[in-house]
Amino acid sequence: MNQIKNKTLPEMTTEQALLSMEALPLGFRFRPTDEELINHYLRLKINGRDLEVRVIPEIDVCKWEPWDLPGLSVIKTDDQEWFFFCPRDRKYPSGHRSNRATDIGYWKATGKDRTIKSKKMIIGMKKTLVFYRGRAPRGERTNWIMHEYRATDKELDGTGPGQNPYVLCRLFHKPSDSCDPAHCEEIEKVNFTPTTTTRCSPDDTSSEMVQETATSGVHALDRSDDTERCLSDKGNNDVKPDVSVINNTSVNHAETSRAKDRNLGKTLVEENPLLRDVPTLHGPILSEKSYYPGQSSIGFATSHMDSMYSSDFGNCDYGLHFQDGASEQDASLTDVLDEVFHNHNESSNDRKDFVLPNMMHWPGNTRLLSTEYPFLKDSVAFVDGSAEVSGSQQFVPDILASRWVSEQNVDSKEAVEILSSTGSSRTLTPLHNNVFGQYASSSYAAIDPFNYNVNQPEQSSFEQSHVDRNISPSNIFEFKARSRENQRDLDSVVDQGTAPRRIRLQIEQPLTPVTNKKERDADNYEEEDEVQSAMSKVVEEEPANLSAQGTAQRRIRLQTRLRKPLITLNNTKRNSNGREGEASHRKCEMQEKEDISSSSSWQKQKKSLVQFSSVVIIVAVIVVLVEIWKESRDAKCSFLFHQLDSFKGMFT
């Protein structure tokens, strides 16, 4: 093979080369790799060995439009790719930018340049370009894509003797938008056949044609349409699209999508039993008639579904949200309350019966909203979801209790005070003198079905039967028979917000206070190096000690209990030993103080003695010096007198 490459082939015309390519059996293709394009074809072309690479013609691609270039290729094939050598045309004489503009449009580079390696050595770069009609920046994108190969070796820069600067262009035509260049790999890896267009299939994602901006994945239905367009692009193909099959595929896909959504909704309902009992005032939320494939099978927003905590931090999101942004708001509470409280003078038979749901799936909440009524505790029995409730032991929605109160001529002002804030309606129910007394206040902190009684213990049952019946006056005796001896007085209920959980810090002081200051000091003295760790435990509040703090289903109380001092014989002995040690310590301190005072007095005396002795020495020295001075003066005077006498004798 190497010998064949090294041999100089005889010069052939284009017609001869064309005939030789057509003489090859079906299935032979010109499919060089990136490494072969750089190391062999581009290297030979730059070094001036044109005859050896004549299979790739030399064309200035910027002087032709992309749809004219396939006719200039030496290799005639049905494959939508062509190879050309293109001389480097600088946009500016002193710059490195290439001029890629044509008469009708321009080639625009997109994406990052990719490296081409040979044995872990970078030998070249590959740039992806897309052809646009018109002029930038308002060009219209087309389906013509080109890969530009350039060598990075300094020996192939085109400045050496006998060299010319060239780049190798690989032209592609993308028949449809089904093959997204941003998500495709090298198109040369696709198995092409001359008589079919299966390479246009949306499942073929082996092209590396990179578009300017990546788009999202195409839906299966759209991809089927793209397949139809792709198959119908070429008129000389043997494979024809079956329109009926494509249409059936689209219909089947739509039905499959709807079935999947229904199954998803049923699965969520089975996993969340509360979702089976979510009626509104006007009927069920979900039904076959109200189902839309674009909407979620569950009415609640997915952000609240399966949440451990309720999303009620100041934002009362009571609407039923769908994926398309629409929402179905709850029934107006004003109309409901007007019907309950302001129409109690009318006959109960003329009123419109209504029932609010006894349980709702408040986002993040997995318990019954109202599972037990204190005033129905004797007459209403609660059983598992598998059991049936019959007779008088049936579950009655909480809103009917307020209606019964109105039927017994209880003042509505005394019964309920509506507070309209943040889209919710809460009630403060004193009800001191009515038939239910404090039970009504402990029953429901809100008429709104989304607000449940936080003081009720959790129930294991999530299903109760819905009842649409009215309570006759004879049933009131059952409520009157209810004893109120052990009921709590919740008239002082304080609404503290809608946070999902409350944590209380309760610190209990020691039961036996230490009154003796000395003993306390002794204990501190003995145990100053000990660290007493507080015993903390989290206990669930008993229902009898709860006060309404919001809408959370559980309350957690953090109790910190300090260690209680134990008064034992050991403590007494330790206290006595501490007192003795303190006394001895004080004696030592006194003795040290005396020693310090005595030493300080001795130091003062010593200092005074030193000062006195120094003064005496100084005085003695002064006296000696004076005496010496006197003697010297007397001697000098006598000497002078003697000299004077000698001079007198000489003159006389």
UniProtKB/Swiss-Prot annotation:
Polar residues bias: start-end ranges: 198-216
Domain NAC per the UniProt entry, residue ranges: 24-174
Main localization of the protein described in the UniProt heading: membrane
Protein name (record): NAC domain-containing protein 14
Swiss-Prot/TrEMBL domain comment: The NAC domain includes a DNA binding domain and a dimerization domain.
GO terms, molecular function: DNA-binding transcription factor activity; transcription cis-regulatory region binding
Protein encoded by which gene: NAC014
Tissue specificity: Expressed in roots, rosette leaves, cauline leaves, shoot apex, stems and flowers.
Species of the source: Arabidopsis thaliana
Keyword Transcription: yes
Positions carrying Phosphothreonine: T152
Top-rank lineage group of the source organism: Eukaryota
Compositional bias ranges of the Basic and acidic residues kind: 220-241, 577-596
Disulphide bond pairs: none
Transmembrane segments: 609-629
DNA bind region: 123-180
Chain residue ranges for the region called Disordered: 198-244, 510-529, 570-600
PROSITE patterns according to UniProt: NAC
